[in-house]
Amino acid sequence: MLAAWRIDVAALRCIGLAFPGLVDPIHNRVISTNEKYDDACSISLDKWAWENWEVPFCMDNDARLAVAGEWWQGAARGKNNVVMMTIGTGIGTGVVIDGRLLYGQHFQAGSLGGHFVLDYKGRRCSCGNNGCVEALSSSFFLPTIVREHALLSESFKRDADVYDFKRIFRLAQEGDEDALLIRNECMDIWASAIITYIHAYDPEVVILGGGILKSQEVIIPYISKRVDELAWCPSGKVPIVPAILGDDAALFGLEYFMVKQQQNERICI
């Protein structure tokens, strides 16, 4: 990786990792992986970084680092209360409250927005709950969503395993009624999740991220309309905006994290 980026090893000052699981960033350890990279919980990454590179190491949850990046240098720059929802294989979230990243007692606050339950009788999620946002509307569950949908044609269901959101949105744009139904139902679920985040965290702005935002011209107006109609916001509408840093958001978040660590500044609440 260093060679690919043409970085001299001698110039290396710190190693950072954005990890898709619950992370203790104080002790640089993975707490829980939800059946992904389970061996990570037993690895001393601090030790690995020092033994191999003789540099300090830092890490955090990938979605939390993404919101940190967008807050520091991206779509939420200048704001103090921010929620970011990243739509992809799963549903990731990160939260900034009063100018600090939200962690909670056990470092999981703000990170589990994909596992907020919207339908307690709904589809079983990988976390063990029923009807989580992720189980109802993520890319990982999309083939299952298609196969189990009672209103879709059998011809559409036959290709369930090859569907991703890019294809669903393209087919919907071309007028395919089955794809349009799935697309709109998923956007309704994302809107419902955002309404819940707004009620829980009272943000100034909500950021949407993930590769699916290549269709932001469809997603942002649709979700904004639903949220404006249904969210309880006496102080006014909460803007929903696309992320602007793309896949680099978490890298900017890591940079923010490293800078604050070197300055011995507190970054969390």
Report each predicted region and the residues it spans.
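Generic structural signal for well-ordered alpha-helical scaffold segments
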Residues: 2-6, 68-73, 184-198, 228, ...
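Glycine-rich phosphate-binding loop and adjoining helix at the ATP-binding site
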Residues: 3-15, 21-81, 218-229, 233
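Short glycine-rich anion-binding loops that position phosphate/pyrophosphate groups of nucleotides
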Residues: 20-23, 88-90, 212
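Glycine-rich phosphate-binding/hydrolytic loop that grips phosphoryl groups
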Residues: 58-71, 213-269
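Glycine-rich phosphate-binding loop of actin/hexokinase-like ATP-binding domains
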Residues: 77-136
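Short secondary-structure boundary segments
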Residues: 87, 139-140, 210-211
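A mobile "lid/hinge" subdomain adjacent to the ATP/sugar-phosphate binding pocket shared
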Residues: 133-207
